[in-house]
Amino acid sequence: MFPIQIAPNDPRLTQICARWDLTPNDNAEFSLLFEEDILTLKKRDEPKLGGIMVDFVSGAVAHRRKFGGGRGQAIAKAVGLKAGATPTVVDGTAGLGRDAFVLASLGCRVLLIERHPVVAALLEDGLRRAYLDGEIGPWMQQRMQLVHGSSLEALDNLEDKPDVVYLDPMYPHREKSALVKKEMRVFQSLVGADTDADGLLAPALRLAQKRVVVKRPDYAEDLDGVRPSTRIETKKNRFDVYVKAAMG
């Protein structure tokens, strides 16, 4: 049961608390509220940080879908997207769903796993609104589905084996940019670092049919100390690729 502050007279929030096993508590560090029909998370003692929400329809995520480089971008190469190969993906650390959305917008079917109940609630709300959108709703319903649960368990319990398992464990950020500061300060105080992240690699390798992709900051060590088959490097991050079979 995770404590959260909510408005007492909003039945939608009461329902969300029941669904995600959240405990309404007026002394909680975080609050959930609806702002213009968008479920929003706020850190109550730092109101200047603003709210965190999931929005696939507008803003930076939508801009990346339209102008982000398509199948030429690093994440697409990392999961093996190419002509004649559109892999199925399990995102074992879904977070706010941005990377999963990029892959879905390029044609992949993505199953999202998120273990933190507040993050899962935000993600489900973002998906709810995206499913209703006239432009992206039809393919979003087909390609992005959410599962709430620990990846450590879910990766061993899924019956349908995906081509790719994608992991982006929470890692302490060193950057000082305003966006990273705002989101990561809220997020890291909410969920903390994924201290058990090393335990994800083995079940991910068991589940994936073709490859496991791990997104890491450029300064981070290899997940579980295991050297990847190859790396794809970007300005601040890298994608460590553990190949099991050709994409073909």
UniProtKB/Swiss-Prot annotation:
Transmembrane segments: none annotated. Gene3D superfamilies: Vaccinia Virus protein VP39, YhiQ-like domain. Pfam families: SAM_MT (PF04445). Its EC number is 2.1.1.242. It catalyses: guanosine(1516) in 16S rRNA + S-adenosyl-L-methionine = N(2)-methylguanosine(1516) in 16S rRNA + S-adenosyl-L-homocysteine + H(+). Its main location: cytoplasm. GO terms for molecular function: rRNA (guanine-N2-)-methyltransferase activity. It is an enzyme of class 2 (transferase). It is found in: Cytoplasm. Keywords: Cytoplasm, Methyltransferase, rRNA processing, S-adenosyl-L-methionine, Transferase. Specifically methylates the guanosine in position 1516 of 16S rRNA. PANTHER family: RIBOSOMAL RNA SMALL SUBUNIT METHYLTRANSFERASE J. HAMAP family: 16SrRNA_methyltr_J. Belongs to the methyltransferase superfamily. RsmJ family. This is Ribosomal RNA small subunit methyltransferase J. It comes from Shewanella amazonensis (strain ATCC BAA-1098 / SB2B).
